[in-house]
């Protein structure tokens, strides 16, 4: 992206700010990210150490700066759907996040109906532009979901890893999770 408002060069300062906001010393964050010394942490924060996605994610996780993990995904292009992170100020109030989620769900439902109609009308050989406004509206659910989850972590102590583990167990039981490698190979043989 040519006009990216985020710059990788700013990541060390963002890491320093997140550490300070979490009330951690350089010594404390060093221990939390894998037994690193204060000098190493200082080098990271001054842009003298090579930043990896793993280091940045671990750092921001220890600082409970979840939006910053989204920033890492975006800056390092770790996933095609990685987008600009949500402003942390929007993730402070769970009731506002629920209201936003309901609003986004309603709009996404309409957009999904429009998309379904577009797909039904689409015929072989007929070239028509994708309905990007509708697809974007559906994409907005990703941010709305993160806003709700992050706000529940901050205001009600939701444990994200526990939620992810529960979802994974249920998805495996319901057979909607990605099959293990052996299963995929067996199907393709």
From Swiss-Prot:
Protein name: Uncharacterized HTH-type transcriptional regulator YqaG
Lineage, uppermost ranks: Bacteria, Bacillati, Bacillota, Bacilli, Bacillales
Entry-linked InterPro entries: Cro/C1-type_HTH, Lambda_DNA-bd_dom_sf
Residue ranges of domain HTH cro/C1-type in the record: 15-72
DNA-binding region: 26-45
Pfam families: HTH_3
Superkingdom to which the source organism belongs: Bacteria
Annotated transmembrane regions: none
The organism of origin for this protein: Bacillus subtilis (strain 168)
Keyword list, A-Z: DNA-binding, Transcription, Transcription regulation
A molecular-function term among this protein's GO annotations: DNA binding
